[in-house]
């Protein structure tokens, strides 16, 4: 019945927030004893994943639960996600696939043994130091901040939202499309090939996700 469903939801959320989350952030999957964890690739204990179904996806889930129940327990869980995403937000306003609470040096160290050996995942093979539109990580995070801000108009969520909006507008090319990564990386080509991440990108619904976010902002 409804009471059992609500109790199960709260138990699951409490487990995720208290036992699984890393300062409000998440990866994709974990061993039962939490000794290893993965996003699209294996992560270190200090890392979180932005790329769905990672941290922003959990934020949307908590907001959905809050809307369904009116229980602030879920809103507070969403706020913890927001804290992690504010840490992970690039100064330009977008997000990378991943973030590391241990700092940039630790993140760069991850790229050496793990990222650079990412077969078929070329974008993980180099630390670009910028943000990506690939796989909707930036779009999911931006939409989450929009929803969170609109919910209670808490001013602390207006700044990351405004930065995300500016990022999407600043990175759009005059013909209307977006690159895969922004700001433009310098000398970032792989395997002797020119860098492709500044090219107009339609893969993984880059343009569609950005347009959807902007339409949500307008509405």
Report each predicted region and the residues it spans.
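Extended ligand-binding groove/face enriched in aromatic
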Residues: 19-218
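Mature N-terminal segment immediately following signal peptide/propeptide cleavage
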Residues: 2-24
